[in-house]
Amino acid sequence: MFYTIMLERFLEYIAVEKRYSPNTLISYRKDLQDFSLFLLETEAHQDLVKVDKKIIRNFMVHLGEKKIAKRSINRKLSSLRSFYLFLLKVGDIKSSPLENIQSLKFYAEKQIPFSEEEMAHQQLEINKPLKKSLLKELIIETLYQTGIRRAELVNLLLENVDFSKGEIKVIGKGNKARIIPISKKLSSVMAEYLLIRKPLEADKEYFFINAKGKKLNDKFVYSAVNTYLSLVTSKKKKSPHILRHSFATHVLEYGAEISKVKMIMGHSSLASTQVYTSANIEQLKKVFNSAHPRAKKNVDL
């Protein structure tokens, strides 16, 4: 079976029928092309029908030997599962070599949110914005004040920023749109940024534009966040996702309803949001020690 043709049919299917985002399509294409190259190098063919469980396991070993993270290996397996389910659906194969192939087990590193004190050091000076640094500082504030994902920030459209209503519309996973409120302070700085924003014609629809007039990429956002947060914290993890994590943790600590936070975060299930309720155990200890009668009086049991 011709691999390239079936790959394109599959990508068209998940784009049209499943309405997967462009970023998701890029990930699927990369994962499946990696497997295609592996087949060619180790089996001297790209026949999907001839792929069996042994080849899949060899692919996993190959990725492990290249020091690919377990999370990334599992993602590639997930892409292959979806691909073969599609081939089953259209009747091109009778069974999937991924059946009974287990994902790798791993312990995810605990995400530690930034404290309010750390974030207080990283605030925009509205009265004295520096032209060169305003974009990068605005990126950080937008991520922290809205909780949006890096890809959602990069793909934010100019027309989806409503200054009159104080809200933005972002397109999340599965091309699902959601409305997120923005503070007057953030709105003011975003409006100020528009005064120095000079996009190229091809990228004028995007809100965030780099100095060359082009749409931002993920690498630029990650670099901006890492550089600026290095000035205020010694934490090892300084990624855009940590700012999203910090947003959720802080608004929940201040009493926001978890169901409302779920909507803002764009989570499909409440379980994803509940992760953030246990993020700051020290805060819970402080509440207990200051509020519980026995903790306050240090009564022996």
Regions found by a protein language model. Name each.
Residues M1-L301:
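Conserved catalytic core of the tyrosine transesterase superfamily
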